């Protein structure tokens, strides 16, 4: 007879961030326990790792220390950098334990807008787990009082509405946009650049960003003008906590935040009716994809790869992924989640949750480059300068950001050019 040790479960480490609030950590802990109890082969140890940026740092540190995590919920725009630096496994290393290639699974089962961020140079390195786009949250009760009939469809309408909603005597603001350098600022800024008709980065080549461009200058000027010229938004760097607090206390008309915050926004909008709409357009309607994907770090054993595959397929199964979507407000990247009876009932009961899906036809990949975090912060830190000071010009800000980003990407660019690029 086999001893107990021979029948022991394969143990794997699973790192996950909770970008919204403490409830997500509790829910993920429940999902892990449910998986562990459901089968005899795998024992998953969940490790909560803070936000997206710290999750990347902790996963890389664990790998360097010889304890690579078998599975990590990683910000979807980190896949490129991790793959180029040879830190993560191509997903086929896990999918060889199943009956199809990772790329086929990705293309068949997931919304097309998710594909680009999951693949690097044609190889699938990630499987989407939960996704978001920025959306416009608005206080419908305040809209009604101000005589605003529908959410703004264009930047001009957004500004006109924000003016009607601003009341300095009450400390009430028309709109707030997050401008923090934790990816929120850059994400929302990229949405404005795209809506203004521009491209934010080269989607096919990780060594190019387009910070110093007319569309980026225009988006930055629009943002700065909302504060200093139109006076419909407070000055300084605003974080998502400040914005949601102002919104819940009835002191804010509109906010551009993630669909991933829908559950949180719904729960806390108690004294008024919460409205949700697509982001307004300027030259075009456009939003970036956000959220996170599952990646697997190099250095794990074959047994751990097999175990990781089992847990991964569980996490993205229509039932589990759909339930996570309903709990959080992130949309499920797995198309079949929306065929489940629970999801159909949920969308019927709260149509606001369908906005992110409707926006998918206007979605584009999340910016991802070589050294993506530092390259992102180059622009975000200039965004901070612009919102902090009316005298900082958008032109100077994008020039400084471009210079810093180019210097950061230079090693990759030189390697591609086969020579030093001056």
Go through the PLM ranges and name each one.
Residues 92-109, 179-180, 196-218, 267-269, ...:
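Short, solvent-exposed loop/beta-turn-alpha elements that line the ligand-binding surface or hinge
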Residues 38, 146, 217, 221, ...:
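Extracytoplasmic/periplasmic substrate-recognition and gating elements
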């Amino acid at each position: 007879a086999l001893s107990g040790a021979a029948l022991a479960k394969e143990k794997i480490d699973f790192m996950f961030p909770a970008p919204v609030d403490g409830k997500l950590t509790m829910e993920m802990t429940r999902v892990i326990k449910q998986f562990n109890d459901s089968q005899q082969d795998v024992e998953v140890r969940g490790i909560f790792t803070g936000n997206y940026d710290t999750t990347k740092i902790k996963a890389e540190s664990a790998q360097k220390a010889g304890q690579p995590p078998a599975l990590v919920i990683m910000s979807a725009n980190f896949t490129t950098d991790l793959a180029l630096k040879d830190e993560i496994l191509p997903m086929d290393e896990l999918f060889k334990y199943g009956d199809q290639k990772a790329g086929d699974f990705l293309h068949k089962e997931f919304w097309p807008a998710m594909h680009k961020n999951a693949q690097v140079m044609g190889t699938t390195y990630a499987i989407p787990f939960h996704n978001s786009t920025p959306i416009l949250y608005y206080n419908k009760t305040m809209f009604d009082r101000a005589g605003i009939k529908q959410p703004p469809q264009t930047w001009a309408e957004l500004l006109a509405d924000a003016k009607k909603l601003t009341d300095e005597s009450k400390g009430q603001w028309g709109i707030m946009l997050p401008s923090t350098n934790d990816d929120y600022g850059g994400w929302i800024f990229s949405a404005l650049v795209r809506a203004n008709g521009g491209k934010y980065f080269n989607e096919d080549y990780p060594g190019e960003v387009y910070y110093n461009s007319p569309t980026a200058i225009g988006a930055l000027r629009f943002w700065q003008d909302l504060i200093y010229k139109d006076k419909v938004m407070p000055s300084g760097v605003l974080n998502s906590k400040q914005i949601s607090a102002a919104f819940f206390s009835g002191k804010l008309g509109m906010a551009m935040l993630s669909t991933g915050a829908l559950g949180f926004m719904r729960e806390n909008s108690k004294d008024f009716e919460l409205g949700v709409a697509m982001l307004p357009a300027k030259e075009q309607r456009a939003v970036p994809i956000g959220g996170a994907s599952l990646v697997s770090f190099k250095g794990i054993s074959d047994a751990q790869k097999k175990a990781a595959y089992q847990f991964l397929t569980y996490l993205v199964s229509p039932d589990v992924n759909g339930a996570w979507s309903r709990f959080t407000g992130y949309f499920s990247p797995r198309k079949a989640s929306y065929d489940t009876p629970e999801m159909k009932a949920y969308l019927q009961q709260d149509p606001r949750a369908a906005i992110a899906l409707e926006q998918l036809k206007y979605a584009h990949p999340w910016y991802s480059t070589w050294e993506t975090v530092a390259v992102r912060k180059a622009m975000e830190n200039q965004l901070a300068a612009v919102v902090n000071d009316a005298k900082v010009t958008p032109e100077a800000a994008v020039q400084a950001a471009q210079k810093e980003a180019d210097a950061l990407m230079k090693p990759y660019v030189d390697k591609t050019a086969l020579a030093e690029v001056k």
